[in-house]
């Protein structure tokens, strides 16, 4: 019974946070919707922050585990982005909350962790000394994975073919265009190493 109430509170909190925002939802709102006292909510969760962590931490833990699994040996971008998408799809119900609620993004114990994970993912995609252009492409690739998960109306990503399409798009975002500064620098360096490029 207690475990069932715990899950009911968490599910209601997720629904309310997504509609009214974390800041706009109170413990009193949750208690009223469930027809219980605030004390009954506090019996299961010490605070609204505790509830938020109950919802968000499984996703953050899974991202940390996924990053850890893909550091040695270094993954290909496709392997990393595919694994990242799998984690996000597993926890898709909380992705919109993280992606759209400023209070959650700036939460003192959640925001820094999200930013650190994003930095780790960028570094795995580009290397530690990447150019600004490469970092921008990495951000675009990560956005290509995130954004479709919060599209309205929701997109069907249960089909493996759709997931492959999404990963293909993210990998493509990592490739420099012909006019990219990175490509011009590489071409200049290669030219300098040829006999015609030597002084």
Residue spans of the language-model regions?
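Secondary-structure edge/capping motif, primarily at the C-terminal ends of alpha-helices
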Residues: 70, 98, 102, 152-153
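Helix-turn-helix
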Residues: 8, 12, 16-50, 54
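Short helix-capping/turn signature of helix-turn-helix
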Residues: 45, 86, 100-104, 143, ...
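Hydrophobic/aromatic-rich alpha-helical bundle segments in the mid-to-C-terminal region
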Residues: 95-96, 107-118, 125-199
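Solvent-exposed, amphipathic alpha-helical segments
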Residues: 12-19, 62-70, 144-148
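Helix-loop "lid/cap" segments that line or gate small-molecule binding pockets
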Residues: 82-89, 100-104, 124-127
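Hydrophobic alpha-helical connector segments
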Residues: 54, 65-96
């Amino acid at each position: 019974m207690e475990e069932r109430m715990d899950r009911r509170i968490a599910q209601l909190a997720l629904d309310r946070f997504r509609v009214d925002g974390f800041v706009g939802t109170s413990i009193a709102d949750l208690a009223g919707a469930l027809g219980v006292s605030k004390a009954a909510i506090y019996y299961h969760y010490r605070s609204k922050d505790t509830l938020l962590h109950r919802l968000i931490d499984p996703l953050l833990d899974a991202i940390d585990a996924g990053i850890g699994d893909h550091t040695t040996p270094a993954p290909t971008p496709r392997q990393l982005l595919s694994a990242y998408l799998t984690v996000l799809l597993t926890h898709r119900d909380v992705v919109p909350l993280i992606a759209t609620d400023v209070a959650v993004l700036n939460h003192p114990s959640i925001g820094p962790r999200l930013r650190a994970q994003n930095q780790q993912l960028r570094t795995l995609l580009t290397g530690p000394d990447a150019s600004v252009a490469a970092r921008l492409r990495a951000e675009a690739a990560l956005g290509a994975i995130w954004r479709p998960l919060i599209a309205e109306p929701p997109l069907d990503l249960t089909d493996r073919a759709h997931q492959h399409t999404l990963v293909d798009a993210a990998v493509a975002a990592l490739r420099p265009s012909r006019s990219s500064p990175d490509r011009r620098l590489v071409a200049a360096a290669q030219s300098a190493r040829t006999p015609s490029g030597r002084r």
